[in-house]
Every structure is written in structure tokens, then in C-alpha cells.
Amino acid sequence: LCDRRQRQMCIRDSISDEMRALVRDLLGLPKRQLFVTSTPTDLSFVLTMPGEFDLTGLTYNEVPPAKNVALQKGDYFAYLAQHDLLLALPYQSINPFVDLLYEAADDPDVVSVKITLYRLAGSSRIAAALAYAAEHGKQVQCLLELRARFDEQSNIDYSRMLEDAGCDILYGLTKYKVHTKLCLITRRCPGGICYYTQVGTGNYNEKTAEQYTDLMLLTCLLYTSPSPRDTR
């Protein structure tokens, strides 16, 4: 797909008014498929502009993401065993989830980490945390959707990086894109197995988590083996 995209028909070109009818005829395009606009199709360059100019007096004061005071000590497993945690991005930071992955990697009672990945940030701390967990003996499974539009090559590169670190990589379904944002951490707890689950509306992307409005819920379920009386 990445190679084919370089050879497909163009979707935008800069031409004079005189060339418009000729090009339309040569390409066999009906009028309804030809749009004339002065707006660039790709506006990603706008994201770099604030750093190029002095915007003093033109912007609001920066509001840093709020921190959860209850999590300052960093014992996420103990906290989530007693409380659910709902993060409202970008007003709160995605860092607690990233820290949870690193805590899972270092916790000897954690058995596995399973996660679905769609769009990751460049130099992704989440991908680094998953690789770190696999390198520290955790079973890490990543369902990585390669067909995230315009992020295909990035996802291919991340799949190789994660696989080299020891993660098990799955590539989703043939007919459908996997947009689900789910993470499941399995951990041995006194009395049974604890399932720490994260479900959210936004990608596992630390950069867009500072811009897009999303919700991220972290919760925990303790599963205890049924006693003989319970199985009757």
C-alpha cells in the first residue's frame, strides 16, 4: 500500500485556468469530480508554525494538564484496586497510563499486557513501555492495525520494533479496521487474579492527547477461583 500510494493518480495539482479543461478531458473526469480551491490539501505544516513566530500577545496563557493528586506516589495498582480512574484528555495528562505500563513491566506479579494499537506518536513512549515490558519477561500482545491511513509505514516500523523486543504482534482483521482502544493487564493478586483494564476513545498517542478531547477509563476486577460450594 505504501509503495502503491506513490504511483497512484494524483488527487491535487496546481494548474492554470487554461489547463483545467484539457486535464479534465485527458483524465476522463466528470465535472463533479474536479474541485478548484486555493486551500492546501495537507495542513500538517500548520502545527509547526507556532514555534517559528513570536506570538506574544496573540495567544492565551498555556494551561498545563491537571495532575491527579491521589496518584503522585505512583502506586497505580494499589489505587486502581480501590478506585476507578477517569481521565479527561487533554485537560488531564495521559502520563498515568504510560506510568502504569512501566509499573506493569517492573512488577513481578504482572503476567501479561495486551493492547490494541492504531495511531502511535513519533518516538512513542507507549511503544517504548511495551517493548520494555516484553524485555522484562512479560507476555506482551499487540493487535496493531497497519491500515491507519497515512500512518501505515509508521505502524509497520513500530510492529518490527515491538516484535524485535519480544512482543507478540497481531495484525487485525481482513475486512475491517480495528479502531478499538483497549488495554488489559493481568496481575497475580492475593486471593486470585486482578484484571486492570483501560478503555478509551482516543489513540495511544501522547502528542494528540495534548490536543484532542477524549476520555480514558482505567478500572480493575479481582477474579477469585470458585470454591467447591460455588460450583454446585
Where are these regions (language model features)?
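Flexible loop/turn segments at secondary-structure boundaries
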Residues: 14-19, 43-44, 93-96, 119-125, ...
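Phosphate/diphosphate-binding loops
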Residues: 146-211
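Beta-sheet entry/capping signal
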Residues: 8, 84, 110-114, 139-141, ...
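Mobile "lid/hinge" segments at catalytic clefts and subdomain interfaces of large enzymes
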Residues: 214-222
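Primarily the HKD phosphodiesterase
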Residues: 107-165
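N-terminal non-catalytic structural scaffold regions of very large proteins
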Residues: 4-112, 127-129
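Short secondary-structure boundary/capping segments
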Residues: 23-28, 129-130, 156-161, 186, ...
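Single conserved hydrophobic/aromatic residue that forms the stacking wall/gate
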Residues: 1-7, 11, 223-232
